[in-house]
Amino acid sequence: VTEERLDTGAADRIVGSIVDSTGISRAKTFPAHMLSWFVEVGAGASPSWAVFCVDDHLAFTPSLSVTGDLRLRIDRDRLRRIGDGIRWAPAGLYDQNGTRSSLCTRGVLERVVDALAGIGVQARIGHEVEFTLVGGHGEWAAYGLGAVLGQDEFVADLLRAAAGAGLGIEQIHAEAGAQQFELSLSPTDPVGSADDLVLARILIGRTARAHGMRASFSPVPVAGGSGNGAHVHVSFTRDGRPLLSGGAGPHGMTDAGGSVVAGILRALPGLGAVLTGSVLSHLRLRPGMWAGAWCCWGLENREAAVRLCALTPGNPHGAHLEVKPVDPSANPYLACAAILGAAHAGLVGALPLPAEVPVDPVRLTDAERAALGVDLLPTSPDDLLAALASSRLAGDLFGPSLREALLAVKSYEFGEFRARPPAELAERFRFAWTT
């Protein structure tokens, strides 16, 4: 392998990372002159990386234990400067012969994108990033001008870091919780969007530390407080034509667009362990939290799991869906794969669009919700695990080894922590997903 020197100093380095089954980024670092090695050969990584839990326990399975070895190889085309002589790139997991491992979550998303392309459909995804600054001070008001200006130096440095890393940020504002921010990333291809989400969290974490703070990406950083979401905005086209506008269906949806919505709604109950599967997630995924706890869809309905953002002059990116239940404990590659895989299943099955729910579902009677087929998404550990184990879609998307790893990790975490008080869990895991 030819070593390659970058235009950097001797102490400069390259960090390559993956995201594991519990949503935590795991990484290895090479000196900058070893770039080609990191790309072509990679760093050693035990298959046990797939069964790391949120507390670093290893939830070994019959097929994933202390034996074997994989290679962590970075995607050179995604190499980005993150400051202080550090470049970062997303990595994939490969076996010793150079074949993509079935445990590689980035590879799972790539396969789903290819499956959509096989039926002529392309997707674009943009992520919302919610986080809470711990150690910040000052008065706070949701969407408050004073709240943003009070952290103006942090915001300015974050935007500079993003520009230097080639990360598109479209807006940033103060959120409902004290010292809570939300920023929106520019939409792009699905794999690139997940890479961008990981990069955004890196830059947010580094910038917060530089200002004497820490950024929490926990679903519930403070018990009883506002939760952090990770809403996923996704649009679909076929042969260049949008599926969610220009049709004769509700709000301009095409029949295919209706099938996308139907596929996602049908799949969501079986994918909760992937999208909202931390020991804190159930504290956020509740009615009244704008977290999409109800399994239904509606135009600009922020209590629905799937919010339709229709094509209007105020929506320059075009019609798209916001999948609201997802929280920051989710692996972004698996979350995007789950959503796109569900959409693919809806399209292949030509599923009909369910009835719209145009109001907050909590305002409906039990009988009205039953007539519309509206129910809360599962949040109990037993329900989440059983749904993941029995979901045909999850099996098709993730394969036996990765699903086995997911079930092992979530089973351990729920068993170990489900009885702990919310305040204890919020404090213990406040920075578990911080980079």
Where are these regions (language model features)?
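Glycine-centered structural positions embedded in regular secondary structure
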Residues: A27, A91, G227, A343-L351
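Catalytic-core signal marking the mid-to-C-terminal active-site face
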Residues: T2-E3, L199, L203, M213-R214, ...
